[in-house]
Swiss-Prot record:
Binds 1 zinc ion per subunit. The active site is at E215. It comes from Pseudomonas fluorescens (strain Pf0-1). Zn(2+) binds at H59, E62, H151. This is Succinylglutamate desuccinylase. GO terms for biological process: arginine catabolic process to glutamate; arginine catabolic process to succinate. The keyword Hydrolase applies. InterPro entries: AspA/AstE_fam, AstE_AspA_cat, Aste_AspA_hybrid_dom, SuccinylGlu_desuccinylase.
């Protein structure tokens, strides 16, 4: 196996490779760009025009997605997986990955779309570097652009594997991409309706990629991810990489639950209180009239929406950040 296939090993050790560029027997070029960043380029005759960005480890304790990318890289470096797409592999927050922590000082996934410019520290610099790497990768004209940012969650979920689909004014969500997600094992997709400061939103909004945050299960340490079943996703990623995806039929959305954002719960002060059990699962339903959260100046969030569910509840976020998202079921009538 080519040494550059061991990107995770290099990243965990904080080392640079002796050789920055290597070629497989079939002529696939692997090029180390910077810490946790590796570009894979197929021979020109095999290139099918897809640029695929795969990122994981934006949160350092979410190891199942990191292990998945590591397996794909090993397969490419051994010549077992023969890419027809250009691929950029990114391990998002190497420092936090080495520590086994979600982040060191700041949540990197709250520092995109200009937010890192208002901050300081190593993680703000890393968010800036990730934007630069993605922008450079997606700079070639007349190519398809696809980005999957892979995560696991800090809590359990009634729907274990789901995706978040960013939003941009004047751009419709793609039915074809949703069918692809369904084939990759996603059970639900949250169709967002406003700009965001996460990585997938940056590549969708600024770089024109079809971009998604994928949540794959519960966050666990390295080597303890047997309970996180990514087999469907892994199979689909290999097919995308090799250009062997089956045709996706119109009924490809069967069984895929669609949700839209009703409201974001923003924590304004240290007095903020979220009236939910600490172990509540993502996608838990909330009754109309329930007082979800309270803050200063008699601010209260009361459930008004039928069928409302909560995802990503986290009262420990910094003031000014999102402490949860209220979502409601939606239909596929506005898809492109």
């Amino acid at each position: 196996m080519l040494a550059l296939g061991k990107l995770l090993e290099l990243t965990l050790a904080g080392r640079e490779p002796a050789e920055k560029t290597q070629l497989t027997v079939e002529g696939v070029r692997m090029r180390w760009l910077s810490e946790g960043a590796l570009e894979v380029r197929p021979p020109e005759a095999r290139d099918n025009g897809l640029d695929l960005l795969l990122s994981a480890g934006i949160h350092g304790n979410e190891t199942a997605p990191i292990e998945l990318l590591d397996r794909l890289l090993h397969d490419i470096a051994r010549g077992d997986l023969k890419p027809r797409a250009r691929i950029l592999f990114l391990f998002g927050n190497p420092e936090a990955i080495r520590k086994g922590e979600r982040f060191v000082e700041q949540d990197v996934n709250r520092l995109f779309n200009g937010r890192h410019e208002q901050s300081s520290g190593s993680e703000a610099l890393r968010a800036c570097e990730l934007e630069r790497l993605a922008a450079s990768f997606f700079s070639l004209p007349d190519r398809q652009r696809l980005h999957y940012d892979l995560h696991t969650a800090i809590r359990g979920s009634k729907i274990e594997q789901f995706a978040l689909y960013p939003w941009k004014e004047g751009r419709q969500h793609s039915r074809l991409e949703l069918a692809r997600l369904r084939a990759a094992g996603m059970e639900a997709v949250l169709l967002q309706n406003k700009p965001s400061i996460v990585f997938s939103s940056y590549t969708y909004d600024k770089l024109g990629a079809e971009s998604f945050t994928l949540e794959l299960g519960k966050a666990r340490p390295f080597g303890q991810n047997a309970g996180v079943n990514v087999s469907l996703l892994e199979t689909r990623l290999k097919q995308i990489i090799e250009g062997t995806e089956p045709e996706m039929a119109e009924q490809g959305l069967d069984g895929l639950q669609l949700f839209s954002v009703a409201r974001e719960i923003i924590k304004h002060s240290d007095a903020f209180r979220l009236n939910l059990p600490a172990d509540i699962e993502n996608f838990s339903e909330l009754d109309v009239g329930y007082v979800l959260a309270e803050d200063l100046a008699n601010t209260r969030w009361i459930i008004e929406e039928q069928g409302a569910r909560i995802i990503f509840p986290n009262p420990k976020v910094k003031n000014g950040l999102r402490a949860g998202i209220l979502i409601v079921p939606t239909t596929d009538e506005n898809l492109a």
